[in-house]
Amino acid sequence: MATGSHTTTLLLAVALLGLPWPQEAGAFPAMPLSSLFANAVLRAQHLHQLAADTYKEFERAYIPEGQRYSIQNTQAAFCFSETIPAPTGKDEAQQRSDMELLRFSLLLIQSWLGPVQLLSRVFTNSLVLGTLDRVYEKLKDLEEGIQALMRELEDGSPRVGQILKQTYDKFDTNLRSDDALLKNYGLLSCFKKDLHKAETYLRVMKCRRFVESSCAF
């Protein structure tokens, strides 16, 4: 097998099989910064796609089509992540430093570690259940990846404190209640939006550090 192919296969294995991140700069084998970014982006993409698929599956199963638009228009104000001064898109993200984007990404991921622990119970008969039962572990894995990047890029600037004063409620498993359905629908909408932000920040950082043909998004 060619050396380039072997390297690509190894990186994919690290990204997709959940191998541990290096815990310190001197860990062996050392992982290049480009690989740390590539792995973090792959994990964020996977989680964002999972969140989007889960949202669509819940919407299809529980929310009448005629009510979706009006409900969606009332949800944006209830995403607690909107209360932090994080960039709202790629253009704004490009104006922030890598360390700022990593801190925002970490904050977004950590805000969901509690709520998602009941997520799989909301989809007891769902086709996506097989992946939802490990979403907490996937979030923890991405959290570790972001922390590994922060260790590598530590610039000596003071660490920011906890900005997010509130966090999200846990998902409601009482699917016979209309209020619970609307609550879960809103939470899934915020989950999707927040993971999209985290993915965007990581991709912006990766692309401006390592110029590549796949930077358009």
UniProtKB/Swiss-Prot annotation:
Cystine pairs: C79-C190, C207-C215
User: What does the record give under GO molecular function?
Assistant: growth factor activity; growth hormone receptor binding; hormone activity; metal ion binding
Residues passing through the membrane, by range: none
Alphabetically ordered keywords of this record:
Disulfide bond, Hormone, Metal-binding, Secreted, Signal, Zinc
Report residues binding Zn(2+): H46, E199
InterPro entries (UniProt xref):
4_helix_cytokine-like_core (IPR009079), Somatotropin (IPR034975), Somatotropin/Prolactin (IPR001400), Somatotropin_CS (IPR018116)
Record family assignment:
Belongs to the somatotropin/prolactin family.
The molecule here is called Somatotropin
The gene designation is GH1
